[in-house]
Curated annotation (Swiss-Prot):
Positions on the Lumenal side per record topology: 62-67, 111-116
Chief place of localization: endoplasmic reticulum
Assembly and binders: Interacts with isoform 1 and isoform 3 of BSCL2/seipin to form an oligomeric complex.
Protein name (Swiss-Prot/TrEMBL): Lipid droplet assembly factor 1
Transmembrane stretches, start-end: 44-61, 68-87, 94-110, 117-133
GO cellular component, one term: lipid droplet
Name of the gene this protein is made from: LDAF1
Tagged with keyword Transmembrane helix: yes
Gene Ontology biological process terms from the UniProt entry: lipid droplet formation
Length: 161
């Protein structure tokens, strides 16, 4: 039963990899994505993946504050139609300044988060490739051993007096 579990995990990972590759292929073959990737902005972001990932994280994280800001703008515009023009200017100014502060903070947070996510992706992918590699057991121990192995002669020489 213990031998069947790693094979099951490996098979599940292969199925997941096939599904993800099909999803990525369907996304990359979309006509709008192809048109964007041929544009200068798409080519620049393709050559700078960290910047593209940071931009994606920033856009996702800034959706809620921008939505709240637009809601406040619409509500104050409706209030202005009722005669509260000075209040609208004040609220939009304060809201715009608040949005600027929030978006600057989200920019720094998204930069830090994308850096941590990419670093954790590199670490996890290297650990997974080390743990689940299809190499024989003898090769796997030598290539993924994080502690250096000491020869027995060196070990005995350390403790002789």
């Amino acid at each position: 039963m213990a031998k069947e579990e790693p094979q099951s995990i490996s098979r599940d990972l292969q199925e997941l990899q096939k599904k993800l590759s099909l999803l990525i292929d369907s996304f990359q073959n979309n006509s709008k994505v192809v048109a964007f990737m041929k544009s200068p902005v798409g080519q620049y972001l393709d050559s700078h993946p960290f910047l593209a990932f940071t931009l994606l994280v920033f856009i996702v994280m800034s959706a809620v504050p921008v939505g709240f800001f637009l809601l406040i703008v619409v509500l104050t515009t409706l209030a202005a139609l009722l005669g509260v023009i000075i209040l609208e200017g004040l609220v939009i100014s304060v809201g715009g300044f608040s949005l600027l502060c929030i978006l600057c903070g989200l920019g720094f947070v998204s930069l830090a988060m994308s850096g941590m996510m990419i670093a954790s992706y590199v670490v996890v992918s290297s650990l997974i490739s080390c743990w689940f590699s299809p190499r024989p057991l003898t090769q796997q121990n030598t290539s993924c051993d994080f502690l250096p192995a000491m020869k027995s002669a060196e070990f005995e020489g350390l403790y002789q007096e």
